[in-house]
Swiss-Prot record:
CDD domains given in the database record: TrmD-like
SUPFAM superfamilies for this protein: alpha/beta knot
Gene: trmD
Gene Ontology molecular function: tRNA (guanine(37)-N1)-methyltransferase activity
Protein name: tRNA (guanine-N(1)-)-methyltransferase
Function recorded in the entry: Specifically methylates guanosine-37 in various tRNAs.
Phylogenetic classification of the source organism: Bacteria, Pseudomonadati, Thermodesulfobacteriota, Desulfuromonadia, Geobacterales
Keywords, sorted A to Z: Cytoplasm, Methyltransferase, S-adenosyl-L-methionine, Transferase, tRNA processing
Amino acid sequence: MKFDILTLFPAMFDGPLTESILKRAAEKGLIEVKLHNIRDFAFDRHSVTDDYPYGGGAGMVMKVEPLAACIEHAKVGSPRARVILTTPRGRSFNHAVAEELAREEALIIICGRYEGVDERVRELFVDDEISIGDFVLTGGEMAAMVLVDAVSRFVPGVLGSDESAVNDSFADGLLEYPQYTRPAEFRGLGVPSVLLSGNHQEIAKWRRRQSLGRTAASRPDLLTDAHLSASDREYLEELQRVAGSDG
């Protein structure tokens, strides 16, 4: 999986992309991340990449010429790449979108800045617009890091266990169950006995119910589209009855 990241600030990516899982994935050749400095494609000696908006208004707009040249340069090495613009107006990024993008051969990610990019960049080059949340960042670099990290988890071999991505929060539409490791007791708090029982059926049942409970408490909106069995629905109804009696 190849990621071409178009940015005005390539140094921002030094830490997040050169440590931990992403570092090992790159060393194994499972992913490739290539940074392209948009300033290198400016047409004037001052490397200007932004200008005042036509019609007036606050802030600056990223110019079309440097971005067009940078995108076309990236496409030489990744001709079938999907071009993504990080922007608050894009579709919401989530687990399913990350899995979808992981099926692409390559992604070209444009990191927006200032008041945004010249609309002609969208019209001529952009295949998809992605937002990581209903808030505004200084630039698209942080969003690009999120995309690379989340998408890479679906690339075969990137995670230590093939089950890791499957069992992550949101993989089945629910939040993940609580996790414990040694020691078995810490400051009076012990590990739930079921996890020490060796009974895998009961462990699976406990984990499922914990996921349901956590999701109902913190992200009830996820339950609408979650894959729920009859047993799941009965348990959720039981939780509602208990909550109602406590209230």
